[in-house]
Amino acid sequence: QISEYKPEWLMLQPSSADLLCNYIIEHNIDIPDSVRYIEFSGELLTDRVRRLTKDVFRCSIANQYGTNEVETIAYECPHGAMHIMNSNVYVEIVDDIGRNVSGTGEGNIVVTSKTNKVMPFIRYKIGDKGCLNVHKCDCGNKAPILELTSARPSDFVITKGGDKVSPYIFVSIFNVINNTLDGTIKQFYVEQSDIDKFK
């Protein structure tokens, strides 16, 4: 589909990009040169996946860090630093009992939403670990830099053949169904009861 549609911009989860790039390499698929920019979000982006994606697509790459609850927390600048979106969230690094970690020490990332007036998230622990760096960045952005050190692992659907498939495949399936049902499905839940059975 990428070859047919010829997109200029892709938004991917690192785990999905890893699977996609390896599939492209294994099947010797030609990637159109229309892809000029790839944005990552949703998971911890490792150096390996970044290099792999850049080698396969040969385009600019940026990383966005956020959650469904508070949206964007930090965004990568051209110099590779993840600057906190101060207008959207307040970020703290705390220990396991909620005390602020001093300096650039590692701890649990907690966020407070500055924009959600209906259901505010205050010191929301998102399950990731990191540290704050306040050194001056050459890009000119004065916002603190968030360094993510560990993140929650992503779930995969394991097929009978042992392949790993992103669970977001179900989102695509239900989007197709909803297009024919005029958006009747508002929520869905999928459970893998056996290696080849879903309900």
Predicted segment positions?
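Active-site glycine/GP-rich loop and adjacent strand/helix microenvironment
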Residues: Q1-K199
